[in-house]
Amino acid sequence: MAITKLDVGIKENSYSVANNSSNITVSATITWSWGTWNAEGSAYGYLTIDGTKYNFSGITFNVSGADRGSETVMTKTVDVYHASDGSKTVSVSAFFHGTNTNEITGSGSLALTNIPR
């Protein structure tokens, strides 16, 4: 199996004027080009969200009989805090390693809602 891409998605779910923060969900989705894969809990990776690292282990899913496809392998929902002027661009990076597959990384960023101050 060859993993060809790791896409990072960032969604702003809500924001709080009182806390000067946003609630976001980050996801990492792999795309593969060929092969069969049974992770059986041996895949692992991490998301780094706004400088904080979140580890994922025991990632399990099966890919069988597909020439290509994609699967979301990591998801995390967190609160991030804005600058004193209410602005915030959140940066995210991701790493994934599966059984008998290559390691792959991805990254992304999103300008969040400017919170009125």
Positions of the model-derived regions?
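Mature extracytoplasmic or otherwise solvent-exposed domains
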Residues: 1-117
